[in-house]
């Protein structure tokens, strides 16, 4: 299916930030993509283009890189505010709303869907509203934000969850725990990628990162195809 691709600026509380839009012709759904700590959706563009080719308009905000592996309440809430601006502007009641995120981006999607997240210092983060996602595709999410009682009991949506067995940033044991918690509320498709690390899900690796996934091209093609099938099912 045809789609157009543009990058433009929008405003949030008089502050401008950038979004990339991959707009599908006669879109079947709207996908909000949320990048990880680095904040750039450009590193995932091949994946997002495949999703757009399958008939979904993709909205991908650009964020400033988080300076620390343990982000603060203020840093995370700033991203959530940008995401809520995007959701208000680009989600429509007549179109299915889907979230797709990697690492801390996947974590923020869970918060937007109703999860009660706490920072490592115990401060609550979260949106002003609970957004009704039809489905969430979560790649190597940061789980520790939701390990307190009742954190995810209000999340009620279909989940596609993938994690790498060789992930040392968000270990597979945490992903399995997240699966066990989430499947109490609804259906969870979980896939543990045997050779994948934390950054294997990025089409363009960050500087100085070597991937444990030996055949990246085949892996990324299969990843994109499976995610596209999930969001359009």
Predicted regions and their residues:
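Conserved beta-strand scaffold positions in the cores of enzyme catalytic domains, especially
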Residues: 5-7, 58-60, 136, 189-192
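The feature captures the conserved acid-bearing segment of alpha/beta-hydrolase catalytic domains
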Residues: 124-187
